[in-house]
């Protein structure tokens, strides 16, 4: 086996240099780093992590202890815990106890031997706190989940007593006479609290004629479920875990379907509905995040417990349709959100009997159709680009207050300024936010953190390789990562650039312009292109194009996919086009970071949803818009690859596990650039028209290598001609 001494000899450096390189220190030249890493690879050297941790005095290791990994409760907790911890550069070890207290005691010794800094545990030991403290862990090192311990300890859980009362209340509201209660071992305090609370609430009522109780382990759950059905024909079965509920469902559907049975259960959160189980939901993903956050930050100060508010019963109610023969026709821009919408509407059809027909159109074709046909569009609902909204809304949409006068009173829970930017026009509500989107900078975190590349960048520029805050920095880094200009770069292109359509080139210019100036027009409607801000933005646009692949991508989805293929260092994208970054074909999963765009003045994008003036089903169309704007539907849409305007979707732990940049994006909406264009005698100059004319001038100038002032003069002339047409 190769040693550090062997590596040093092959790389022709000192052993101290090898040690510095392996420990990620940046005080070594890029050439020596390259030689050391090549020797490491050629000789198959494996770093001794335990020895490395001993030298550092810390291991940055956390542990999660769970009974099993087939119950979604523990899967949700562990996945969120692990994602959070790994983003903080911690390693997470998983230990499975199979609900065996003796086996868990043995695992505790292994956990301690790994120099583990903190443990989150669903313990199987009745006095688990004592067992962990005896092994050498302090009160601060272990957080117990769901089940409180007899000793003073850190604890995260939910209100088991309240959950028992709420499920009992649900049972008493139903037409049930015979009820079965199936729980796990009552040696756990949380399960005992739930059981006692449920039964105490039930016995106070005379509505239930019989309650049959069974206690089971996971290993015996099938035979105990069978005992329930052979003892009685229950009207409802209550369980304290989703695993037991799914077992009840399986046994019932296969062997006892002669009589309807409702299954009511404590459950982790399901973003996508489960129709066969009535679920009282607990957010174990949030518990996982909170547990990891505590163990890393130790920020609880004078408290010992955190009680998570239960989400309660999942609410997917049936909607009473005014006419089950109705069909709603929807016209939509083709996008990932439209694909998600096609799936979500199946639930609406199931619950209402109303058929939904969605017609997709590409961006340019739909713009021409909507602009030319206006109110004559043969659709009930139109999903149009946010940029068209100020110009086309009044000719296409029925004001929603004409359909429901107090509609504004029911619009809550949206992202900051979403209603202002996506719904209101001249003081009236013409649409609901469809898919609010915002620009984010995405970059290859693995490359930005590579020790050799960081050193090489410093040697070239005498500056640290950091996430760019200006487009000058952005282009310097893009140049560095473009292999054509720097053969030390491991990838081909420094940045992406969407240049296939004039409108997208216009956006490339505008995002850079708005990093220098908040306004593109003066108070008289004159375009501010004869300015240093415009000249700087155009230079930066031309440079960025030079550091890109120069492939003429027609839309943001195409350039985002190029980034996902792994040959580009960074790019700026609207967040409604980037779900592919974590897709099965992505080569950058787990390798990306994200930040506010350079200049801290991002542009908005996305779509709005409105009721067509043509529609003969305006009431039903508005009901659909309100349904699609619900918190639960919004969260499901995002999880399926779309976007939502609801804050709850961005706060959902499962959504943030899937698309971890969304929590950050939510905070950026308040900084978004919205003052794009002026009013000319009461008529808006549409942003699409503005982007197109800018894009035509900029693209022509780049391709033909025109002088910067000449390009800007062309754009100003085109704008003045457009303004005259409006007048």
Give residue ranges: language-model regions:
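Flexible loop/hinge segments that line or gate small-molecule binding clefts
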Residues: 122-162, 265-278
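Extracytoplasmic/periplasmic substrate-recognition and gating elements
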Residues: 329, 584-650, 674-680, 696-699, ...
